[in-house]
Amino acid sequence: MTETLPTPVLDTAQARVLGCLIEKEATTPDAYPLTVNAAQVAANQKTAREPVLTLQTGKVHHALRQLETLGLVRQQFSSRAERYEHRLGSALDLTRQQVAVIGLLLLRGPQTLGELFARSERLARFNDSDDVRHHLERLIQRGLAVQLPRASGQREDRYAHLLSGELDLDALQAAAARAAPSARSGADSSELEARVLSLETTVAELQDALSALQARLDAAGA
């Protein structure tokens, strides 16, 4: 798959599973590539996921096989268990930073530059938010991401991936408007966001440790 080929259109399960493979490659390298069970655990995490999903094992397995057909995932053959790794970077000729940005957008939906920069720490190195913007602009040029119009009450631009096709902008703006803080000052909002991101990182690290343990248990029981 090269730049001249059309962008794959992923369904909800495929997008979530692909995002999980991107995330876990960086955060739990000892447990990567992922087994089907580990991919399911990652897909159904209650933290660092928007929306929270409950995907059954069969659905996750089917999504992995479909992603494999699209050339975005490759199965690693093992005598103990099926394992899968993503090939997004090579399939679409993306840098590590661009893969990280796409992964975050797949897992957490539309986000601001600040959110992407803060949440990318464990996935890829960015110098600052402007560096994130640079890679986003490249993705936008490729038709893989888009800058969203600001909804009422929003102070910053948000970005979304286009691997699942065209977006329902009206629905996204309505959801963003409902979520926008109405009475909190800008300073208070920034401080709260920083605290939330710190807590999310801590919880995500704990979740990664559990995923690694699950992968070892899968291997031992296979």
UniProtKB/Swiss-Prot annotation:
InterPro entries for the chain: DUF480 (IPR007432), WH-like_DNA-bd_sf (IPR036388), WH_DNA-bd_sf (IPR036390)
Gene3D superfamilies: Winged helix-like DNA-binding domain superfamily/Winged helix DNA-binding domain
Source superkingdom: Bacteria
HAMAP family, sorted: UPF0502
Entry similarity comment: Belongs to the UPF0502 family.
Protein name: UPF0502 protein XCC4136
